[in-house]
Curated annotation (Swiss-Prot):
Disulfide bonds join C145-C150. Its main location: virion. This is Envelope glycoprotein L. The gene is gL. It is a peripheral membrane protein. Residues 36-243 form the gL betaherpesvirus-type domain.
Amino acid sequence: MYECMFFSHRLTIGFYIPLIVLTTMSSLSESLGERQKTACTVAAISCANSDTYNRTTVSNHTFFYISDRWKYSELIRYEKPTGDLRHDKLIHVDREFLDIVSLLHNNENQLRTLLTIFRSDSAPPWVKFMRGYSQCLDHPIIYTCVEEKCQQYNLEELPYGKDIFLENVVGFDLGAPPHNMSVLIAVSNTKPKITKVLRITSTSLTLFDALYNTVLTFFRSIGARNVDVVRRLILYQASLSGPHRDAPIHNYLNRDLS
């Protein structure tokens, strides 16, 4: 299922078929790093030289991902706003505004980037207000324009898929329990060479279960059971009782790591 891991102060777990990238903060001993140097290095070089994968760089870390440019993840599905939308404040031309404009201007993945910005936790009020423009029409039509070539889309009829890795997922963030999980997605514009990581909240316990089982399976397979990331995941999972989960699911790994 997985082919290699990359270790540094920032722990990166790479899965190549299918390719998944998970990130979390941790530190590991040099002896653990030595185990994966040969096979992992060969796989990484092969992947980096392949045209099969897209790649992006965030904070000097290169992430590889498989992307279907004609399909979008449910994670960034357009949600038509409800209620009375009003925006009575001035839009300030500040750094945040310029960053968003730079991401969108002449971006070949303009629609995907816009949908991600719409759903991001850090979207400013004026961006959230833009989601309601379609209320002026009877259907949510949008136009994207790149190099003066424009295309029309109906945001409610886009081909959405359940796989979150249709997007450029570079990590997950587990906040304070009982359940506060975010997916980190990198969006880029190659023309001004800008990349920004956006955070989208996920309430999916299924996604957490997959993350939990994947990480524990990997560390068990290399005999590293008592590492910080494993301990934190186990404690986090234990906090998901009560209203978040009536009973443990059947396919959970045995949590006894002794």
